[in-house]
Amino acid sequence: MSSGGLLLLLGLLTLWAELTPVSSKDHPEFCELPADSGPCRGILHAFYYHPVHRTCLGFIYGGCYGNANNFKTIDECKRTCAA
């Protein structure tokens, strides 16, 4: 491969690395999901990871369905998503 081709390849790889979200490298994809209380009407205090603020926040979980970005404790949320 010519030096021009190698430079082009290096440039494309650098661009790809810059455009790849850092969050996908640091924690599971479900940490990017929004808080989802679910359709049930329970009042359970839970925590979810907020990817923009890069921290765990509290929310009210209804008790069913929702998504995987749902933790019983803030420590569990931090260990899973904010590490």
Swiss-Prot record:
Q: GO molecular function: any one?
A: serine-type endopeptidase inhibitor activity
Q: Where is this site: Reactive bond for trypsin?
A: R41, G42
Name the GO cellular-component terms.
Answer: extracellular space
Bilayer-spanning residue ranges: none
* InterPro entries registered for this protein in UniProt: Kunitz_BPTI, Kunitz_BPTI_sf, Prtase_inh_Kunz-CS, TFPI/VKTCI-like
Q: Which domain of life is it from?
A: Eukaryota
Report the leader peptide range: 1-24
Where does the record say this protein resides?
Answer: Secreted
Q: Which UniProt keywords apply?
A: Disulfide bond, Protease inhibitor, Secreted, Serine protease inhibitor, Signal
Q: Which cysteines are joined by disulfide bonds?
A: C31-C81, C40-C64, C56-C77
- Keyword Secreted part of the UniProt annotation: yes
Free-text tissue specificity from the UniProt record: Expressed by the venom gland.
Domain BPTI/Kunitz inhibitor, chain residue ranges per copy:
31-81
Q: Does the keyword Signal apply?
A: yes
Report the sequence similarity comment from the record.
Belongs to the venom Kunitz-type family.
PANTHER family according to UniProt: KUNITZ-TYPE PROTEASE INHIBITOR-RELATED, SERINE PEPTIDASE INHIBITOR, KUNITZ TYPE, 3
Function according to Swiss-Prot or TrEMBL: Serine protease inhibitor.
Q: What is this protein called?
A: Kunitz-type serine protease inhibitor scutellin-4
**What is the originating organism of this protein?**
Oxyuranus scutellatus scutellatus (Australian taipan)
Taxonomy of origin reads: Eukaryota, Metazoa, Chordata, Craniata, Vertebrata
